[in-house]
């Protein structure tokens, strides 16, 4: 999915939430984006991680191209495990967290699905912050490089 599609989807979802009687809640992808910014101290825009390597962005296959792409594969696998073990929908699960001096920290009151998804996102955000970013691995031809 292209970054523009994600933004349109986010705008539609936020509009629908605002039109309901339920107070709007942040979507998980919005929270994850904020966690990434917390972990990397705003050094790299979140959109740079949306179409990177074989696993950063929608889907994923093949062998990760580098350390950053491995972070995305680990995140994908973590979401998969949360879906199986917690029977939850990670992309739509809301949780409470804060940006601490050591990066994103999940609220201790979170349990179950919320805790699992929050931990997946926090671990990935910290991994992103540590991994080198290689411009050559952004927007690669996944058909040929991710088999």
From Swiss-Prot:
Pfam families in UniProt: Phospholip_A2_1
EC number(s) reported in the record: 3.1.1.4
Cofactor note: Binds 1 Ca(2+) ion.
Subcellular location: Secreted
Binding site for Ca(2+): 55, 57, 59, 76
EC primary class: hydrolase
Reactions listed under catalytic activity: a 1,2-diacyl-sn-glycero-3-phosphocholine + H2O = a 1-acyl-sn-glycero-3-phosphocholine + a fatty acid + H(+)
Disulphide-bridged cysteine pairs: 38-99, 54-146, 56-72, 71-127, 78-120, 88-113, 106-118
Coiled-coil ranges per UniProt: none
GO process annotations (BP): arachidonate secretion; lipid catabolic process; phospholipid metabolic process
Function (record text): Snake venom phospholipase A2 (PLA2) that inhibits collagen-induced platelet aggregation. PLA2 catalyzes the calcium-dependent hydrolysis of the 2-acyl groups in 3-sn-phosphoglycerides.
Name of the protein in question: Acidic phospholipase A2 S7-48J
Species this chain originates from: Austrelaps superbus (Lowland copperhead snake)
């Amino acid at each position: 999915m292209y970054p523009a599609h994600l933004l349109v989807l986010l705008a539609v979802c936020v509009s629908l939430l605002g039109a309901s009687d339920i107070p709007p809640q942040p979507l998980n992808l919005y929270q994850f984006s904020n966690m990434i910014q917390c972990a990397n101290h705003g050094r790299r825009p979140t959109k740079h991680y949306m179409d990177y390597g074989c696993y950063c962005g929608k889907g994923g296959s093949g062998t990760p191209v580098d350390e950053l792409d491995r972070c995305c594969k680990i995140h994908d696998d973590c979401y998969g495990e949360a879906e199986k073990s917690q029977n939850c929908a990670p992309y739509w699960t809301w949780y409470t967290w804060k940006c601490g001096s050591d990066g994103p920290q999940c609220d201790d009151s979170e349990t179950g699905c919320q805790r699992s998804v929050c931990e997946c996102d926090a671990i990935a955000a910290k991994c992103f912050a540590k991994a080198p970013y290689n411009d050559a691995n952004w927007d690669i031809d996944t058909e040929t490089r991710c088999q």
